[in-house]
């Protein structure tokens, strides 16, 4: 009886294991042998001062690709303050004041402590940091000192902007937008690859807004702004080793800047007499009230010629730039 039970148990065990083995064999012998990999978007840029990927370097950084920049509606460097940790670029009432702070390090006036590079071209004047950004394919924000590779004025960090490359993208883009306080904007850009050795891109924009504040003195818009500009880029690759990259960018800004209002405290109101200019006001920041409307006008031209030669085991990179800035500021103090 014991032998019968043992043989029966062995038979049941073999029978129960048979479907499992057959099922395993069916999975292994499946006819679908394709493999699917999910990878992030690849953005190809030319960065001559680095030999490793940004995420492989021993530094803290934040990077934005073109799709993310457009989805976040980034119009200038100030907008990145919302999305980049330890980075701040306050709004002081006009595009003239462009102080940048990284990890608490910055400069209110004179030499900046954070540098900005556009397609490898340094922006030298702090008065030109606050500019309209468009035709941008990638932005890198490097936290901490970068003086070893980028020299002075990068004690706090560095911001690198890269334009869309016409060798990698061809087509025409048009962007229209309208918002509150009659915010209006139009951008147009065209990218064309002439052949395997030459490509170019042209872009232009106009933007404006009536503003959020009224000058109580004459009823005019205290922060009205209108600006426009254009950009051109030409790339030439005569050989596999030699590359030329010419960039020219112009922007004009005219705005009723510095919509500052007086701050009135409760103690000042309690002691104000009927003849005091504070009589009848409310506690807090008052609307602008200036007999001469503050305004700011600025012309910027940035041009650069980048040359790269790839030798056998070495690279030679050169960037020659010329920058022009003329502005006018009127502030009622």
What are the roles of these predicted feature ranges?
Residues 285-308:
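Outer-membrane beta-barrel transmembrane strand signature
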